[in-house]
Amino acid sequence: ALTFSACSDDDDDDKSINVPEAVTQALKQKYPNATDVDWKQKSSYFVADCWLDGKDSDIWFDANGNWWMTESEIYWNDVPGAVQTAFNNSEYANWVQDDYYFLLYPLQPMQYVIEVKQGNQKYQVFYSEDGGLMNTVNVTGKDDTIYPPEE
């Protein structure tokens, strides 16, 4: 069995990235229970790669400490029934399911993402919580990072 232990914030930051104090404070304020925090920089964003409520999560902030997005990896059983039904009736139903995520935003509704593969093709299929198809992104041979929408 794997066990995960919480580490003090002092030891978790990637020393090669200079994370602004406003960003580290914003993380502590928004998600005080985040553990095993490792900071990454993606474009102009600072991303806290951490454990949150038992889920591997990426929490996106701008340099001023404004929260833009939380992406958490989940299991199929965590995907709402309406999304499962919509996916099972989609053109991707027979593709290999690779990963599942839910995305939280400050202003936009929550989204669920199902990442699928077939042969050398890879797609991300985005759904609303009620199972509405929102977007399909071809990430074949590309960086499959999901960036926050411009709000």
Show which residues each predicted segment covers.
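First exposed extracellular module after export/assembly in secreted or surface-exposed proteins
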Residues: 15-151
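C-terminal motif of bacterial Sec signal peptides marking the signal peptidase cleavage site
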Residues: 2-6
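Bacterial signal peptide processing site
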Residues: 8-11
